[in-house]
Amino acid sequence: FKVLKRGDKLNLETAQDENDLTDSGLRYDLTLPLSRYYANNASSLPSPFKALQMGSVWRADRPQKGRFRQFTQCDIDILGDATNLAEIELILATTTALGKICPDNGFTVRINDRGILFGMARYCGFSEEAMDSVLITLDKMDKIGFEGVEKELLENGNAKESVDRYLELLRTVTRDAEGVKALGETLKDVMDPAVCQGLVHIMETVKDVAETEFGLVFDPTLVRGMSYYTGTIFEVSMEGFGGFCCRRRTLR
C-alpha cells in the first residue's frame, strides 16, 4: 500500500528506492491533527479546550467485515483537564448521543484503566520486560478466549505460576465498582490506590447522573492502544456491532 507525493512531479529516474516516491498519506484519524492544532495554538485557546469534529479518515487495512479503507469518524476531545470530570463528560456526551440515535438498541460501556492493567500483571509476577507482550495477548481475549490467552502467554515463555494467577484474578474480579474497589485493595502494594479510586468515582458519578439507559461494566481485559494511551479506557459496544466507539486518556 503506497501513496504518492502530494502535488509534486515524480522523478522516476533519480529515485533510489520506492519510498522516495511516497512521503505523504491520507489522514489516518482526527486526533493527531487536533494535537498539532492545539500545540500550535494553546496560548490562545481556552483551558480546558473542548473539540467536536467529524470527517473522513482512511486506513490501509484489507477491507472486511467491520473494517473499511474509508469511513467517517466523529471525535469529541477534551485537552488540558487532568481530572476525572473529563472522562465523565465524555462518557455522558457519548451515551446521550447514542441514546438519541438508537433509542431501541441497548448498548454497554466497558471501562478500565491502563494503571490497573499494569498493576494486575505486576501482582501476578510478570517481569517489566514482558508487560507489553502480556497486554497484547490479553487484548485478544474477545477473539481467542481464556484458553487462547493462556496458551499464548505460556508459548511466550511466561511462568505457569504467573499465568495461572493472572487468569484466576481475571475470572474472579466482579465487573462493577465494587470489583474495582476490591481489586484496588488486592493491588495496593504494586499500584497507586488513586487509580482504582478514580475509576470508581467515574463509574459511580456516571450512573448517578446519566439520563440514558445503558450498561456500565468494569472490564479488566479491555486494553487497546498499547503505546498511545496512558490512563482511563472506555469502549461502547452493541449487540450485532461489537465495539464501535471508544475513548482513552493520554497524559503526554
Where are these regions (language model features)?
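Short, conserved phosphate-binding/catalytic loop or strand-edge motifs used
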Residues: F68-C74, I111-G119
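Active-site nucleophile/metal-coordination loop of metallo-enzymes that catalyze phosphate/sulfate
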Residues: K2-G25, D29
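Glycine-rich phosphate/pyrophosphate-binding loops
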Residues: F107
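Short acidic alpha-helix initiation/capping motifs at coil-to-helix transition points
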Residues: R110-N112, K140-I144, K160, A194
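Extended alpha-helical scaffolds
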Residues: I101-D104, R114-L117, A130
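Short glycine/threonine-rich loop-to-helix capping motif typified by GTGT followed
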Residues: F118-E128, S227-F234
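Acidic, His- and aromatic-enriched active-site or binding-groove loops in soluble protein domains
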Residues: F1-L10, G125-E155, M238-F241
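Positively charged, Gly/Ser-enriched RNA/tRNA-binding surfaces
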Residues: Q16-L21, D29-S43, F49-D104, E152-R252
